[in-house]
Amino acid sequence: MFSYLPRYPLRAASARALVRATRPSYRSALLRYQSSEAVGRTQEIVPGAYQIPPRDFSRQHEEKLAPKNAARAPRRIEPATLKLNSKNLSQLQNVTVPTYQREGVKQGIVHVGVGGFHRAHLAAYVDTLLEQFNSQDWSICGVDLQPFAAPMRDALGSQDNLYTMIECDTEGTSARVIGSITDYLFAPDNCEAVIAKMAHPDTHIVSMTVTESGYYMNENTHELQIDHPDIAADLAGQQPPRTVFAYLYAALARRHAAGLRPFTVMSCDNMQKNGDISRNMLLAFARQQNPEVADWIAENGAFPNSMVDRITPRTSDENKAQLAQEFGVEDSWPVVTEVFHQWVLEDKFADGRPPFEKAGVQVVPNVHKVEEYELIKLRLLNASHSAMGYAGYLGGFTYIHEVIADPTFRKYIRNMMQEEVQPLLPRIPGVSVDDYCNTLLGRFSNPTLKDELPRICLGGSGKIPQFIMPSIAEQIQAGGPLRRLTLCAAAWFRYLRGINEQGQAFKLDDPMAEELQAKALESPFSVLEVKSLFGDDLRDDKRFVAELKNALESLERDGARATIAQYA
């Protein structure tokens, strides 16, 4: 269920977790609360349950867990700053650190794409399993495939693969060292080592966060882009491999030849039916290479679908300085995130899995349960992010919390969610979508995250067709309202020109940037001609075309802020 509680098990030594759990702002308004009696000094948060923290804390613990408040005694000692590494771990006084022995833990998970979201999400859940439940077979070997990830290789390598997770909310900040990544491989340095690691019998899951563009799926046909230069190069056997599917196929082919079971391919990307997409793209790639191996994967493999949620901004120099000053930790690349986090995961695995549910993951029996949650999240949270991102950037804002603080933008987002998206969503027993929308507005308003709009705006070619256009298509079919949704698409089309309202150029961060910018500079309306994203149906609908033209004309004539006010 949707929950606003920290989903890690609560312990007396977990700084601020218990305080946050009892704050009214983080109590789930979506669920029927179930009482649960704490056992000893450990209390697990069960999905769908609200639990009262243990009360047998000493005064000392109560003072440590108190929220940041200038009127209270200082909440921590100010130590000398220490470089984060295994040697210094025991000397860090103001952060939660791993107490498990990292050296003897097996790497049952290989994760491709060690970015901020992975480090704040899957790696944090696994860290909880290692810390609280002695899951000794399930640490992570991180993998990056692209040369641009070299700074991550260097940062983790200098810190024994440790990093700090900074959790920010409106009432304070806490920090926790994550130790679940116990090995790291950089494919440009040694692609063979990556394939060998995936093929190793100890590897049971290969998970990935490679973004929408990393799946090479035609958004119109939902088929693998066989003619894409990267896919074509991998199918031709060029070295080093360019795509995740070349690595997955090579490793699975070795396991097939060795008589091993296939590993589970677990997508953690923010896409609807991410498991099904992973399966279809990999099988299409494998059939081009060896139909026998493809059939073996299809029959024996597993590709669980999931819904993932945690806002994770880019790490700034300011975040690093804050970590050093307030917590005494020198970390080359900490990850910054919110307190809220959620993961709904289909229970479909080929070769075993860790007890994810013990760490707060909502493990569900079939894909239909996942689809209900992910549809709500993608159509509300991600669509709203896009609506704020493109129009907000054009309007001169810098951060998401600034956009949502603007009364006209806030009204526009709320009305778009309630009037144009909510009527299209499934009804889930025990879940109030109205309350979920209200909670989203609160999450967007968090000023401590400083979530920059350029992060929200990157990769729009993989976002708008997934988050916005399906709702527009359904409203067209139903004859329902679509003005605000169409304005979101129009703002993206206008954004693709790469020129802001002050006439200043900016760089587009999108895998289709060259093609899309050329269309937008010709005329923003021409972006609709890109069939791989939009097909033909939308261009043929007179009502949508009229709404799109009106929105584009208003953006051009009046600017983003005035247009939002008209549409709110």
Curated annotation (Swiss-Prot):
Gene3D superfamilies in UniProt: N-(1-d-carboxylethyl)-l-norvaline Dehydrogenase, domain 2 (1.10.1040.10), NAD(P)-binding Rossmann-like Domain (3.40.50.720)
Enzyme Commission (EC) number: 1.1.1.67
Catalysed reaction equations from the record: D-mannitol + NAD(+) = D-fructose + NADH + H(+)
Entry-linked SUPFAM superfamilies: 6-phosphogluconate dehydrogenase C-terminal domain-like, NAD(P)-binding Rossmann-fold domains
Sorted UniProt keywords: NAD, Oxidoreductase
Alphabetized Pfam families for the sequence: Mannitol_dh (PF01232), Mannitol_dh_C (PF08125)
Positions annotated to bind NAD(+): 109-120
GO MF annotations, alphabetized: mannitol 2-dehydrogenase activity; mannitol dehydrogenase activity
Assembly and binders: Monomer.
Chain's role: Catalyzes the NAD(H)-dependent interconversion of D-fructose and D-mannitol in the mannitol metabolic pathway.
Entry's family note: Belongs to the mannitol dehydrogenase family.
Name of the protein in its database record: Mannitol 2-dehydrogenase
Organism annotation: Phaeosphaeria nodorum (strain SN15 / ATCC MYA-4574 / FGSC 10173) (Glume blotch fungus)
Source taxonomy: Eukaryota, Fungi, Dikarya, Ascomycota, Pezizomycotina
